[in-house]
């Protein structure tokens, strides 16, 4: 298959509705994976910019399909409600979708509430300590594996956990360091612990049995990392000081 026939086959597979449906997850802080709602009623974020650029290359329109967290995006993978996404990858998710290149490596750690006496992982991991995580995410699974005594509870949204931490109803929140640093600036007295319990890798992904879509997404992301498209998306979304980390250490 070559030329126009291959291009048509790709569009049929990657954008069956005539638009590229990009699955995104919403949080107030944004970041390399999370997107935000704009005052005008649209969306902003690194995945938003990458999805728009990808649709332009395909010559189709773009439509964003908003979710509360990455676990919901994974659950929707088999339902045919989205065509492309950018989300944290782990072995469990690799059974439910096809992943292309990694474009972000994030360090997962914990933020502790104002007044907490925990200074490191050892003093945090005590019986009776309540740790929140976003439900059904790679970070939540990592925190459950990491903490032997503290109890990890999953919540649907970042907003809900923000409120619980702000009110002192949970002792800590597991998430990526860049997100937690942003949260610490908004909740006086909270602290982000210095250690890292897991490196979370974020990558482009397509539903299972979409080989043409995966090949296109892989080529697109490889080029985006090398030609400045990804850097521009970071810079446009408040991540000017964040280096591109496309490989684990």
How would you describe each model-predicted region?
Residues 7-88, 227:
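Extracytoplasmic small-molecule ligand-binding "clamshell" domains
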Residues 9, 138-153, 192-193, 222-249:
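Ligand-binding clefts/hinges and TM-proximal coupling segments of bilobed small-molecule sensing domains
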Residues 19-26, 41-44, 122-137, 151:
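Short loop->beta-strand "edge-of-pocket" segments that line small-molecule binding or catalytic clefts
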Residues 20-21, 59-61, 78-87, 128-130, ...:
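Alpha-to-beta junction loops
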Residues 48, 63-75, 119, 153-167, ...:
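Short helix-initiation/N-cap motifs at beta->coil->alpha
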Residues 52, 56, 61-125, 191-194:
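Acidic, polar ligand-binding/catalytic clefts
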Residues 71, 88-96, 142, 166-198:
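A ligand-binding cleft/hinge motif common to bilobed small-molecule-binding domains
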């Amino acid at each position: 298959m070559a030329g126009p026939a291959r291009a048509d086959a790709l569009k049929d597979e990657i954008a069956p509705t005539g638009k590229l449906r990009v699955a995104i997850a919403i949080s107030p802080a944004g970041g390399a994976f999370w997107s935000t709602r704009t005052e005008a009623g649209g969306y902003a974020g690194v995945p938003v910019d990458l999805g728009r650029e990808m649709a332009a290359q395909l010559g189709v329109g773009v439509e964003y399909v908003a979710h509360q967290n990455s676990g919901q995006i994974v659950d929707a993978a088999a339902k045919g409600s989205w065509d492309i996404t950018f989300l944290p990858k782990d072995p469990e998710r690799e059974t439910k979708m096809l992943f292309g290149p990694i474009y972000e490596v994030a360090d997962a750690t914990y933020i502790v509430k104002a007044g907490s006496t925990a200074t490191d992982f050892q003093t945090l991991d005590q019986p009776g300590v309540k740790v929140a995580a976003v439900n059904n995410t790679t970070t939540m699974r990592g925190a459950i594996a990491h903490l032997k005594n503290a109890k990890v509870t999953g919540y649907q949204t970042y907003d809900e956990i923000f409120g619980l931490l702000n009110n002192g109803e949970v002792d800590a929140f597991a998430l990526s360091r860049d997100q937690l640093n942003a949260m610490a600036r908004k909740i006086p007295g909270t602290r982000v612990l210095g250690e890292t319990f897991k490196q979370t890798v974020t990558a482009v992904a397509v539903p299972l049995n979409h080989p043409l879509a995966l090949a296109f997404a892989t080529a697109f992301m490889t080029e985006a990392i090398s030609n400045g498209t990804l850097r521009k998306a970071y810079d446009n979304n408040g991540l000017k000081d964040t280096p591109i980390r496309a490989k684990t250490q």
